[in-house]
Structure formats: C-alpha cells, structure tokens
Design a protein with these regions (language model features):
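Contiguous, well-ordered alpha-helical segments that form the cores/surfaces of helical PPI scaffolds
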Residues: 251-264, 285
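Conserved catalytic cores of very large enzyme subunits
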Residues: 1-247, 268-269, 273-320
Length: 320
C-alpha cells in the first residue's frame, strides 16, 4: 500500500544518495592520485595541472566540489599533501561569500582544507579587475587561473571572446631578479638597463617559440586540437597549422626573487622599508608596461606573472 511504497522510495533515495556520494569521492580521489603519479608530461613528469571550482550551485556540482575538497584534505599515502592539481576556489558574492549564500558551507570547507593542505588557493570574481569580464549566468567569464598562476581571460587578439575556456598559456620565461641586482652592485640605473635588455631577450624568445608552435599541425596535438579543446580548433582540419588558434593563448614573462633583489639593491626588502617597496613597485610596473607595449604592437596576449618556482628557486641559487 501507499505508506510502504513511500517508505521504500525514501529508503532507495537515501541509499542512492549515499552510494553516489561515495562513488563521487572515490572518483575525486582517483583524479588526485592519478595526477600525482602519471608521468605523461614529456614522458617523465606529472602534468602541471589546476582546477578552478566553487560556484556551481547544482546538486551535482556541489557534490563534486565537496568531494574534491575532502579528497584533497585526506591527502595521498601516509597523509602526504598532493602537489597537483593546483586547487583554486572561486569566491563570489551571492554564491558562496556570505552565510546565507547557497555554497557558503563549501567555502567554509575550503578554508578548513586550505588550513591543513595549503590548497585550495582562492580567487575573487568580485575583484574589479575580474568583475569587468564577468557576465552572470556564463561560467566561461568567471576568472580562472592556471597551475603556473597565469590569469587567462583578457584577449587582445579577439576582445569579443574574453573567456577562460579553450585557452591557456603558451610559454613563459622567468627572469632572475636577484642575479640582476647582484650584478648591478647597488646601481639602480644599471639594474634597470639590464632588466630592459633581458625583457627584450625574453620577448624575442617567446616570439620564436610561438612561431615554432604555430608551425605545428592539428595532427601533432590529437587531443588538444583534434578533440576541439582549444578555442576554434574544431574549425581546423588535421593538416592545418595552429596560428589562428594559438593567438588566443598567452605569452608570459615571469619574475622571481623580488624581495631578495630589493635587499641587494637597497639593503632592505619591501616589508622593511617604504623606499624598497616603492622601488619594487617601480620594477614590476616597468615590466608590466613592457608587456602591455608588446601586446599593443603585436596584438598578442603578453602577460607578466610572479613565477611559482617550485623547482626553479633551487636551480637559480645553485647556478648563481
């Protein structure tokens, strides 16, 4: 009769939710474990990967967000913190920022996990430099960051398509600021001359690599291009070259060791002296202006970033 049917339905529903929740957790756990063990990048490295999440309020989306966070919190074998993927939790007022927002509980969970694992990092859609691109109801316009911390959304090549999906960073080269500071021997003018020279060299290198990448064909990238992952790649045939697709990507110059560079040049870093802080801002502003100048000249997306340098920091110290 009706009460029994209702009881059976309730039992089936609760157990289905429980099983789906468990299966989702295992899927997220598998994703994290696979991305830390598969050596498919250049045949010898794990993929440098990142995932951005936090704003999906659907039942399914919330289930995935919750379980990717719980799997990250649990860690790898022996409780080790997973290096990849880089987790970025997107924060938006009306979605997960305030206590009354539908995903506020997931924001609190993200804070708990970050306190233990240092991931996820957090991005703010409402920040003015991100909000200018945001269109409500269009997740493609929600800011996303790559594993290398490249911010991909502005598009000088095609301003009508300032979106995050189907795009990425093509190449970046890092400048060793402490080395330039040491060579300048506290001569600020000499430092900036060396920096300008190195910026020009980096841009030449990025353009050279870009031309090599553009000369490749769709068949050389059967997944990224052949499966239509990159923006406009679905319009190409197997023998087409890639320039019109790759122009949507970014070409980046990174910098490392700003604090150490300031210490060498002034005796103090930006946290110890207002003079050093002003010089630090001048250094970064000069590099940013050079990137903007190149963007205007070429119509390509040149960007500046602070290199994460998980491995490079040690290499540069040894080289110096």
């Amino acid at each position: 009769d009706a009460p029994i049917v209702k009881k059976i339905q309730s039992f089936a529903y609760k157990n289905s939710l429980k099983e789906t929740d468990r299966a989702t957790y295992q899927a997220m756990e598998a994703l994290i474990h696979n991305l830390n063990t598969m050596n498919s990048r250049a045949g010898a490295q794990t993929p440098f990967s990142s995932i951005n999440y936090g704003t999906d309020t659907s039942i399914e989306g919330r289930l995935v967000i919750k379980n990717i966070l719980l799997a990250e919190e649990a860690g790898l074998g022996n409780g080790e913190t997973p290096i990849f993927p880089i987790h970025i939790f997107k924060i938006k007022e009306g979605v997960n920022f305030d206590p009354d927002d539908p995903n506020y509980d997931l924001f609190k969970l993200a804070c708990r996990v970050s306190a233990k694992r240092l991931f996820p990092n957090f991005s703010f859609i409402d920040a003015p430099f991100n909000l200018q691109y945001y269109k409500e109801g269009n997740p493609d316009t929600e800011i996303a960051y790559m594993g290398c911390r490249t911010r991909v959304i502005g598009n000088a090549y095609d301003p009508t398509r300032e979106i995050v999906t189907g795009r990425g960073n093509l190449s970046f080269t890092t400048i060793n600021l402490p080395r330039l500071g040491i060579k300048a021997q506290r001569n600020i003018g000499a430092f900036f001359d060396s920096l300008d020279e190195l910026m020009d060299l980096c841009i030449d290198q990025l353009m050279h690599r870009f031309k090599i990448q553009c000369s490749k064909r769709v068949r050389n990238y059967p997944f990224l291009m052949g499966q239509g992952i990159w923006l406009d790649s679905e319009k190409l045939t197997a023998d087409d070259t890639l320039e019109e697709v790759l122009k949507h990507g970014t070409l980046s110059v990174g910098f490392i060791g700003l604090a150490e560079c300031l210490k060498v040049l002034t005796g103090k870093h930006h946290g110890e002296s207002e003079e050093a802080r002003e010089l630090g801002l001048e250094i970064i502003s000069r590099m940013r202006a050079r990137m903007d100048e190149e963007t205007k000249r070429t119509g390509l997306n040149f960007s500046l970033l602070a290199t994460p340098a998980e491995g490079l920091s040690g290499r540069f110290v040894k080289m110096d």
